[in-house]
Structure formats: C-alpha cells, structure tokens
C-alpha cells in the first residue's frame, strides 16, 4: 500500500489510475459546466426576446390579475389637456413636451368656440359644406330658441256675473227698433262679436235673446293691444273654426327661431286667449240672458253665438252690449 501511494504521489495523478472515481468527478464537472452555459444562452435569448417584444409591442397586454402601471407623464398630460382652454396654454404644453402637436391644434380650434356656462347639455353642430361649428345649449329656455313661442299660460280670469230676467217680449221689441241690435245666425254658423275694452270703462255687460229656439253662447278674452273701440261682428262657418284651430295648433307646435325675420315674431295663440265663459246652449228663447265681467286688462272680448249644432234652423238674435265704469 505504501509503495502504491508513493508511486502515485501528489504530482503524478492520472485519470487512468482510478477510472471509476476519476471518471465520476470529471463527469459531474462537465455536466455543471454545460448547464451553466445553457442557462447563460437562455438568459441571452430571453433578453433578446424581451427587447424585441418591447420594441414591437410598446403597450403590454393587460391582465386582470396584474395591476396597471400608469405613466405619470401621460396622466399629467391628460390633466393638462382637460385644463387647457386656450391657445397659449396649449403652446406651453407643447414646449414642455407634455402635449402632442395635433392635440394642441385641436385645443386651439376648440378655444374659438367658447360659450358661457349654463345649465343643460352643450350641442355642437358642424356644417357639412363650410365646416363651421355652431354651439347650442340643449336647455331651450336658457338658449331662447323658442323665441316668442313659449307656451305661457294666460292669467286666470275672474268668473263672470250672469243672470236672467223674464221680460223677453219687451226686450225684443225694444231692440228690434234699434240699429245694429238684431241679426240672424244661420244654421251651422258661429257669430263672434268683438268688443274692445274702453279706456273709460271697467267692465263689459251683455244681454241677448232669441226667437223660438236656444243658441250656444260663450265669452273669451284676447290679450292684444286695442287700436280701436269699435264693436265688430265676425261670421264664420263651423268648419272654418275647426280649420283655424288646427292652424293655431300647428303654429304652436312648430316654434319659429328668433333670428328668422321672414317668419315674423308671432306669439303663442293659445297663451293669447283667456276663457271667461265656455260655450253652452242657453235658453235665450225663454229668458233674457244677461251678464257682466270686470276688465282683466287691455284687450278684446269675444262674445260667441254658436249655431253650428243646428243643421236646419236659423236663429234670430237680439243683443245689447255696453260697458260701465
């Protein structure tokens, strides 16, 4: 044993002397070296792949299990984009490299169309031909797009005072002798007597009677400036009244823009008229129908005698209309 150890010596080691042990140690060192080299190659490949992915896909796919990272520069740019309302601020953001040039151009265009802050949504309409942009408010009341066509309710009317008296023959004989106190309302017709308010009066009064048959009667008030105190009589067919009502409804439903000069500045007809007394059939052939109403203001009273429901008979009407102070 000593000769063998001496023969081998520390400086004369040979891999063939102990093939099993020497070969085992050598194999282990070779495997570890090859694994280290392979891992280094994989690291280099992973680095190249990550660099290539970052160059070709700058925005990584979002994952529901991974929090999103927001760049502070992009966030500040978004806040500055919201706050920037003028061209000077947009130019300042461009100099600070916080806002792209194309976004600055958009802000410059938007700064030309500033509107006052109002309640409601803002609607921007761009013309297809000229490219001009109109800024409108969705709040029609504040934008005044309806002009004079707002549906304003008329003031409430005080109820009239009405009464009857039985001296029909005396009343008709007296008025039959006076001029412009007797007329015939033909079948299917509506007669409207227009009575303006008088500057020296405070109330309007009416009295009327008919021969043999009743007639419909109602009182309305037209809120319109008075240019003449003359009493006028207007005769219309029932179909004409229906056509006029349909036209009035169409005019109300189709508001006219305030800037349209050709269409004029018509007011809402429904808000112009007040109802003092609705049209009902009155037994004017039995008793004299009388009444009065205090002036609500300046305007014209419309006394309607309605015979549109009668298809066969004409009605002879005796009436007396006056004012008192």
Swiss-Prot record:
Gene3D superfamilies referenced in this protein's UniProt entry, alphabetically: GOLD domain (2.60.120.680)
SUPFAM superfamilies, sorted: Supernatant protein factor (SPF), C-terminal domain
Region annotation (Disordered) ranges: 1-78, 232-267
Pfam family, one: GOLD_2
Entry coiled-coil feature ranges: none
UniProt keyword annotation of Acetylation present: yes
Domain of life: Eukaryota
Keywords attached to this entry: Acetylation
Species of provenance: Homo sapiens
Transmembrane regions listed in the UniProt entry: none
Protein name: Protein TMED8
Biased composition (Acidic residues): 238-254
Limits of the GOLD domain: 159-323
Modified residues (N6-acetyllysine): 169
InterPro entries tied to this protein: GOLD_dom, GOLD_dom_sf, Golgi-PI4KB_interaction
């Amino acid at each position: 044993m000593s000769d063998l150890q001496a023969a081998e010596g520390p400086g004369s080691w040979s891999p063939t002397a102990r093939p099993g042990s020497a070969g085992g140690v050598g194999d282990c060192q070779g495997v570890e070296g090859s694994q280290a080299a392979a891992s280094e190659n994989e690291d280099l490949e992973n680095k190249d792949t990550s660099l290539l992915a970052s160059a070709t896909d700058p925005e990584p796919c979002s994952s529901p299990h991974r929090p999103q990272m927001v760049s502070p520069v992009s966030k500040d740019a978004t806040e500055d984009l919201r706050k920037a309302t003028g061209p000077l601020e947009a130019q300042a953001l461009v100099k600070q490299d916080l806002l792209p040039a194309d976004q600055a151009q958009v802000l410059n265009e938007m700064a030309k169309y500033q509107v006052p802050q109002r309640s409601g949504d803002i609607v921007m309409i761009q013309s297809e031909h000229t490219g001009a942009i109109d800024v409108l408010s969705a709040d029609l009341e504040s934008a005044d797009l309806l002009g004079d066509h707002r549906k304003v309710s008329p003031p409430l009317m005080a109820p009239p005072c009405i009464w009857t008296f039985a001296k029909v023959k005396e009343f008709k004989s007296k008025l039959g002798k006076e001029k412009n106190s007797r007329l015939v309302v033909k079948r299917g017709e509506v007669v409207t007597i227009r009575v303006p308010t008088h500057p020296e009066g405070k109330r309007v009064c009416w009295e009327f009677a008919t021969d043999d048959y009743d007639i419909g009667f109602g009182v309305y008030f037209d809120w319109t400036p008075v240019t003449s105190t003359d009493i006028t009589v207007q005769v219309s067919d029932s179909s004409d009244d229906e056509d006029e009502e349909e036209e009035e409804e169409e005019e109300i439903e189709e508001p006219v823009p305030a800037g349209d000069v050709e269409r004029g500045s018509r007011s809402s007809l429904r808000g112009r008229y007040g109802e003092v007394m609705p049209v009902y059939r009155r037994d004017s052939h039995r008793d004299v129908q009388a009444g009065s109403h205090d002036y609500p203001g300046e305007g014209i009273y419309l006394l309607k005698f309605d015979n549109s429901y009668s298809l066969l008979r004409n009605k002879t009407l005796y009436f007396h209309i006056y004012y008192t102070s």
